[in-house]
Swiss-Prot record:
One of its GO terms (molecular function) is metalloendopeptidase activity. Gene3D superfamilies: 3.10.170.10, Neutral Protease Domain 2. Residues 1-18 form the signal peptide. GO terms for cellular component: extracellular region. Secreted metalloproteinase probably acting as a virulence factor. This is Extracellular metalloproteinase 3. CDD domains: M36. The keyword Protease applies.
Length: 633
């Protein structure tokens, strides 16, 4: 049975694998003692959105028989009738049905390298939107190819090496002609990962004129650079582009649950190997905004169902740094920060779950699965400050191949109102609905947690992962945690009890479910058991509070991450719409598969503490509890 599950936070009234730590960014990017940022040219692009385009295009005539490339070409010609340009050979129709065509402006047969025009064609064959950075000044009258009054490309290479202090030896460099007008590859160099290249191009300068330059390409590992060296003076560098772009996000870092636990910091390149295209690319396109292979984040103040044209912060240099203050009001005044935080938390959780096995074949949320199994084209659509509700959040999980959708609401429980995106636990809780629904019953079936008890466990898994991730080095098994306390402006949170290993603080037992009739109440019982399980495994294996787990032979080497791994593996093992007993058994089976039951008795003791021990029985109206352990424990 196929289905879609919408889950909310509240009821409606010996190989060792280690992942790198996140890098906290400095204020100025400086590599090899050179500030590359100082060479960047200002932005020149203009963009006409779909609404404005619809009005403008009414006055233009296009043939219905044109293909999308021809239609786009006619638009460029009509917009710049006196300009010369070429079609870039990378046009395609995206998964949303929009055709994308790119053009490069030329002068005297040479590219103006930073003069581009992009046209987006809708499903109806009409221009959807477009943007351009075409040069509108005076083109030099003299063709440089006639007198060839420009410097040797070797001098340009040496100029780039000197200006940027590159580790490239170019004394013996010799140019070899390659495909393309005035294009060369340099032989006899050392220090670069591949042979440096150069080709002659024009470049728009900041003062509105064109400069004839050598575009020198050097791949030195940490940087893959395009250096625009003046073709008449090799000591002058006009612009530098680095293919190895570091993305930076100013956010509450991973592990900080909400603003009471710390301050926003700038974090650079936080992705792991789980995101080989980084967070701002899907392997096919790079996005200078909060969009990538794993997620697309935007605001949604109207609460509508569309998202692709909603607002997102834009940053061509991938520096997503925006102000936030606890006294700022309304939340829309800091929407850039909110969207960035939501994008960060969602991607960070994607990468962690990937390390535990929620990958392409398991039905995770990605556009491009890279031929690794599963169905792609299903990133998570995550809406910040969604206007369709307040004081809650939800996640819709269709089967694998269709995007999940998270809606994060503002909370009116405090003055000023609070944004749920800033409480990581709520985001993690919601995304976990996607995890559990894709794993339980298989990625193609999203209807395997729709019974009262199984749906309750769906809520409990969300609380468990949210709590496990926020643990701090100072915490012990006596540490208690709430759920949703900051957003709800209530230190007790939004659950009946705190998550605690103390039965006086949290008295929930397995038989408590007999009197509960709401999924979040039942979920609190399940999450309480998993919280006990986590601390039992931490006592057995030690705890680590690093952002990423360390594995040996596929087994997390600390109790906290081991508990997350076993619980997740259990989701994939259990039947469709399981009960507590079956889910407990699935976790035991997960440990058997992963560690050959090395933690069997530890797991049994944790569940037995709250009455889900050996001999506990399920009955919808009269569950039987047990504190017993099986033989051998």
């Amino acid at each position: 049975m196929h289905g879609l599950l919408l889950a909310g936070l509240l009821a409606l009234p010996m190989n060792v694998l280690a992942y790198p730590a996140e890098q906290h960014a400095s204020n100025v990017l400086s590599r090899r003692g050179v500030d590359i940022e100082s060479f960047r040219l200002p932005l020149k692009a203009k963009y006409m959105d779909s609404e404005a385009t619809a009005q403008k295009i009414q006055a233009m005539s296009f043939s219905k028989d044109d293909d999308y490339v021809s239609t786009a070409t006619k638009l460029v010609k009509s917009t710049f009738p006196k300009s010369t340009f070429r079609v870039v050979d990378d046009h395609y129709i995206g998964t949303n049905g929009i055709g994308h065509v790119h053009f490069k402006q030329t002068a005297h047969g040479l590219d103006i390298d930073n003069s581009d025009f992009n046209v987006n064609i809708g499903r109806d064959g009409k221009v959807f939107s477009f943007g351009n950075s075409f040069f509108t000044g005076e083109i030099p009258k003299e063709n440089p190819m006639v007198k060839r009054a420009f410097s040797d490309p070797v001098k340009a290479l040496k100029g780039a090496v000197k200006a940027l202090n590159l580790p490239v030896k170019s004394d013996n460099a010799k140019p070899k002609t390659i495909a393309g007008k005035e294009s060369f590859e340099f032989m006899g160099t050392t220090g670069a990962l591949s042979a440096p290249k150069a080709n002659l191009v024009y470049l728009q300068k900041e003062d509105g004129t064109l400069a004839l330059t050598w575009k020198v390409e050097t791949d030195v590992g940490d940087n893959w650079l395009l250096t625009y060296v003046d073709a008449h003076n090799s000591e002058t560098v006009h612009n530098v582009v680095d293919y190895v772009a570091s993305a930076e996000y100013k956010v509450f870092a991973w592990g900080l649950n909400d603003p009471t636990e710390g301050n926003p910091t700038s974090i650079r390149d936080p992705w792991t190997d789980a995101s080989p295209y980084t967070w701002n690319s899907d392997g096919m396109s790079k996005y200078p905004t909060t969009r990538g292979n794993n997620a697309i984040a935007q605001d949604n103040p109207t609460g509508g169902s569309t998202y692709i044209n909603n607002y997102r912060p834009q940053s061509p240099n991938l520096i997503f740094s925006y102000p936030w203050s606890p006294t700022a009001t309304p939340p829309s005044s800091y929407k850039d920060f909110s969207i960035t935080q939501l994008f960060y938390t969602t991607n960070r959780y994607h990468d962690l779950l990937y390390s535990f096995g929620f990958n392409e074949a398991a039905g995770n949320f990605q556009v491009n699965n890279g031929n690794k199994g599963g169905k792609g084209n299903d990133f998570a659509i995550v809406n910040a400050q969604d206007g369709s509700g307040t004081n809650n959040a939800n996640f819709a999980t269709p089967p694998d191949g269709s995007p999940g959708r998270m809606r994060m609401y503002n909370w009116t429980t405090a003055r000023p109102n609070r944004d749920g995106c800033l409480e990581a636990g709520i985001v993690i809780h919601e995304y976990t609905h996607g995890l559990s629904n894709r794993l339980c019953g298989g990625p193609a079936n999203s209807a395997c947690l729709n019974a009262l008890e199984s749906g309750g466990m769906g809520e409990g898994w969300g609380d468990f992962y949210a709590t496990a991730i926020r643990l701090k080095p100072r915490d012990t098994k006596n540490t208690n945690y709430s759920m949703g306390a900051w957003a709800a402006n209530n230190p007790k949170g939004i659950r009946a009890y705190l998550y605690s290993t103390n039965l006086q603080t949290n008295p929930y037992m397995y038989t408590s479910v007999n009197s509960l009739r709401e999924v979040h109440q039942i979920g609190t019982v399940w999450a309480s058991m998993l919280y006990d399980l986590m601390w039992a495994l931490i006592e057995a294996h030690g705890g680590t509070y690093s952002a990423n787990p360390v594995f040996r032979n596929g087994v997390p080497q600390d109790g906290r991450h081991l508990s997350m791994k076993l619980v997740m593996d259990g989701m994939a093992l259990q039947p469709c719409n399981p009960n507590f007993v079956q889910a407990r058994d699935a976790i035991l089976d997960a440990d058997r598969a992963l560690t050959n039951s090395a933690n069997k008795c530890t797991i049994w003791k944790a569940f037995a503490k709250r009455g889900l021990g050996y001999g506990a029985k399920y009955d919808a109206r009269n569950r039987t509890g047990s504190n017993k352990l099986p033989p051998g424990c």
